[in-house]
Curated annotation (Swiss-Prot):
Coiled-coil parts of chain: none
Domain of life: Archaea
Residue windows of the TPR repeats: 102-135, 137-168, 169-202, 204-235, 236-269, 273-306, 308-333
Disulfide feature: none
Source species: Methanocaldococcus jannaschii (strain ATCC 43067 / DSM 2661 / JAL-1 / JCM 10045 / NBRC 100440)
Protein name: TPR repeat-containing protein MJ0798
Keyword Membrane: no
Length: 334
């Protein structure tokens, strides 16, 4: 559905959507109804705030961009709810025997999840959970909630699953991921370490732990990244994480080794920029100016904003105390 960018029309659609959800609340279920109403209310509030800002000031690119985001979210939500209500009508027309089969609801939820219809998946998992409160369903609901950014609620269901089975891998991983997304590093580390107790070779958990330790303890971070890399030796993302962690630790020769390894794996343009910029800076730190300039020349072939590169070079020379060289490149910015 294409929503035209008009405040009154938008609010009218949002209120119609809200009324439609409330009218079908018995079919949708209390929890899912509250979630949908909360999403609609947030959009109404934000749309009003942005429209008020635009009416007071001349529209700028930022406010118009924010408004476009609201319309995009509204279009997506409208389609999701419309599809959900349509699917509910079809699903509830099933035979009485099928409606009482939790596995059927689980399968319908899995299918919806696969198609990224997360509200529909939640509806089906809710129906399945009414019939069977097993750990698999609790975790499936938790992951569907994560997809909808309902992290607090997701934690509630992962915890329920964990209470039933303290060593449930999916529940522990879900808790680790939920806390990671909430920037609660302490709890995220706690649960990902529990995941590793169950499976020391879980690459995702190792990578998450590397990222969680990166800011506070690079030595621990590098250990986790390298363990993950042993299991996925050609993963360029992991190779670069190892390289950048060594760079942060000022272990420049180790960092170069991994940046060079990444270059052999056909990195994309964004990765190439990161690699050549980092290698150029490292060679300056090591006093190997010729190699540094070679890297920055390659960077110039990728990044057309050469003044940014000159500024990076100048700042790096300034960092190592070579003021004359820094001045040379600052002049190129003029």
């Amino acid at each position: 559905m294409a929503i035209k960018m008009d405040k009154n029309f938008t609010l009218e659609i949002l209120n119609l959507l809200k009324n439609n959800v409330l009218k079908n609340r018995l079919k949708i279920g209390k929890e899912l109804t509250e979630m949908l109403i909360d999403e609609i209310d947030k959009l109404i509030e934000t749309a009003n705030e942005i429209s008020e800002e635009i009416s007071k000031n001349s529209p700028n690119n930022s406010s118009l961009y924010d408004l476009r985001l609201i319309y995009n979210k509204l279009s997506t939500l409208y389609e999701d709810i419309d599809k959900l209500l349509g699917e509910i009508e079809c699903i509830l027309s099933l035979s009485n025997k099928d409606i009482k089969n939790w596995k059927l609801w689980k399968n319908l939820g899995d299918k919806a999840y696969l198609w990224k219809a997360y509200y529909e998946a939640l509806f089906c998992y809710n129906k399945a959970l009414e019939l069977n409160q097993n750990t698999e369903l609790l975790c499936k609901k938790g992951y569907a909630l994560l997809k909808l950014y309902k992290r607090d609620l997701a934690i509630k269901y992962f915890e329920k699953a964990s209470e039933k089975d303290r060593n449930n891998y999916k529940a522990l991983f879900g808790l680790g991921k939920s806390y990671y997304l909430m920037s609660d590093n302490k709890n995220s580390i706690k649960y990902f370490e529990k995941v590793l107790e169950l499976n020391p070779n879980d690459v995702e958990a190792l990578e998450y732990l590397g990222e969680l330790y990166y800011e506070e303890d690079c030595e621990k971070a590098i250990n986790y990244f390298k363990k993950a890399l042993e299991l996925k030796p050609d993963d360029i993302d992991l190779i670069l994480k190892v390289a950048f962690t060594y760079f942060k630790l000022k272990k420049y020769k180790h960092a170069l080794k991994y940046f060079e390894k990444a270059l052999k794996l056909n990195p994309n343009v964004f990765e190439l920029e990161q690699i050549y910029e980092s290698m150029g800076r490292i060679y300056i730190y090591l006093g190997e100016d010729e190699k540094a300039i070679e890297c920055f020349e390659k960077l110039k072939e990728i990044n057309l904003y050469h003044y940014e590169i000159y500024e990076i070079i100048a700042l790096t020379y300034e960092e190592v105390g070579n003021i004359e060289k820094a001045k040379e490149f600052y002049k190129k910015l003029v």
